[in-house]
Regions:
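Conserved acidic carboxylate
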Residues: 9
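Regulatory hinge/linker segments at domain boundaries
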Residues: 135-161
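Acidic, metal-coordinating helix/loop segments flanking the phosphotransfer/catalytic sites
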Residues: 33-51
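Active-site residues of response regulator receiver
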Residues: 55, 83
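The feature encodes the CheY-like receiver
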Residues: 59
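Acidic catalytic/metal-coordinating carboxylates
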Residues: 36, 62-65
Length: 165
């Protein structure tokens, strides 16, 4: 059975390139192409794709907002962000919204094919640079927690009082 993929991308050339590479695969088919967020939001649930490739900054709506709304309605669908944004705010907002993967548009098209396969199997595909940023974020958080654990009881009490004003 083929993996059913939908594309939400307002750049018509990139949208078509994604469709072409998906349809070229024997185990995948592009079941829908959307060039704006409004149509995607209205129609995706009825199509029931296995995987959705979602741009973040569409002309009319935020791809992150669309993912947030649709993940509850479509729990069996994996959403992969496919965007040019590589900043931490966008990455973590997309993942918190329910995206299962995050790719940058500069990735080779075969990486996108592999990401679709990975997401369909329950994985969390990410571009190399994105995965590195996610790891760094958690490593920085670990250092902050370790630093707090080095404080004495009195120092922790002072910090608590300072935080309360």
């Amino acid at each position: 059975m083929k993996i059913r993929v939908a594309i939400v991308e307002d750049d018509k050339n990139y949208n078509q390139a994604l469709k072409n590479i998906i349809d070229f695969q024997q185990n995948m088919e592009c079941v829908a192409q959307f060039f704006n967020g409004k149509n995607a939001l209205q129609k995706l649930e009825g199509i029931e794709p296995d995987v959705v490739l979602m741009d973040i900054q569409l002309k009319d709506l935020s791809g992150i907002d669309i993912v947030f709304k649709l993940t509850e309605l479509m729990p069996g669908t994996s959403f992969i962000m496919c965007t040019s944004f590589e900043n931490d705010e966008k990455i973590f907002s997309a993942l918190r919204a329910g995206a299962s993967g995050y790719l940058v548009k500069g990735d080779p098209l075969d990486k996108i094919v592999q990401a679709i396969l990975e997401a369909h199997k329950g994985g969390a595909p990410m571009s190399f640079g994105i995965a590195k940023r996610v790891l760094q974020h958690f490593q920085e958080t670990k250092v902050q927690v370790q630093t707090l654990s080095l404080l004495t009881v009195t120092e922790k009490e002072v910090l608590e009082l300072l935080s309360q004003g």
